[in-house]
């Protein structure tokens, strides 16, 4: 119905926060860790804002590539609330803008080489796959192998559709609903069996399952399982 009413939002304030790999880098930096970030942004306003905010936090951005003609992945979220309940807002709408295609072979190889150059000074590698064409299978597996040869642990947050990229990682992160979905696909009797199957298939050292209010569960390649419940702070 072309005459149907549409929501009209009054914008009271707005803020810009780096997400994805930049968010992880800022989180690690806030813990006092020295971070070497390797990713890419587009040659647009959003890309410039991300680099500026990272630099303002003291994070080295020399490994952040700017790709001409590419849009920076941007998520615009609109929150709303009643005037009497301003402290209880909820998301009304999310609009996404950004690339879905993989980087060109040359840019991808350059990004991988940039990350490789930081291995010798690293105590751990964190790979986070957002399925937006930046972390390729070849690049991820090359980094995992090089880190393994150097005795550097690799922690990875994989996409369910790209688990092959995480083969050989020391630890992978999963949301509990993601493991539940894979449990059904694998026709496993429970999540523990699904975790064991996945760990063996992809040669992971461990799988950490994030269960929200239920805490976290660590499944290890040696069969050991550890559960840590949430605690009130």
Regions found by a protein language model. Give the residues of each.
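Glycine-rich phosphate/adenosyl-contacting loop at the front of the ribokinase-like
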Residues: 1-36, 228-233
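Gly-rich Lys/Arg/Thr-decorated short loops/hinges at beta-loop-alpha junctions or inter-strand turns
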Residues: 1-9, 85-101, 123, 174-181
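A glycine-rich beta-to-alpha transition motif near the start of alpha/beta enzyme domains, typified by
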Residues: 41-57
